[in-house]
């Protein structure tokens, strides 16, 4: 999966699957699931947590696009935030302390850490948007220029 998360990789996926109907996409996912199921129990930490973070992030993207909220207090959201906290604890202890002591919901923290909140939105939540923004360069995430949700 060379180039995964790059714009070129994303565009290649759109070109490959963009003409499929929702039913055809569901069938494709259905045939792929057993392959993942057969190996997922062997995924080590932190890869498995990253896998969960990615899945729940895209689930929430779809929910937002469809206007169907839900799953905001799920174990998957907790695991996704935990994935980031493990990284931030080492790289930025003050931000780690802020994120683990705030009253901001885990869902809003996840959406902030995955590029679904502007700095202004993060600040309005009571988070240090500028400090969070410093973690985006070199990651697969980028800050939106305009409010996403």
Question: What are these language model-derived features?
Answer:
Residues 2-6, 31, 38-149:
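Structured surface interface patches that mediate subunit assembly and partner/cofactor docking
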Residues 1-39:
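Hydrophobic/aromatic-rich structural module bridging two neighboring secondary-structure elements via a short loop
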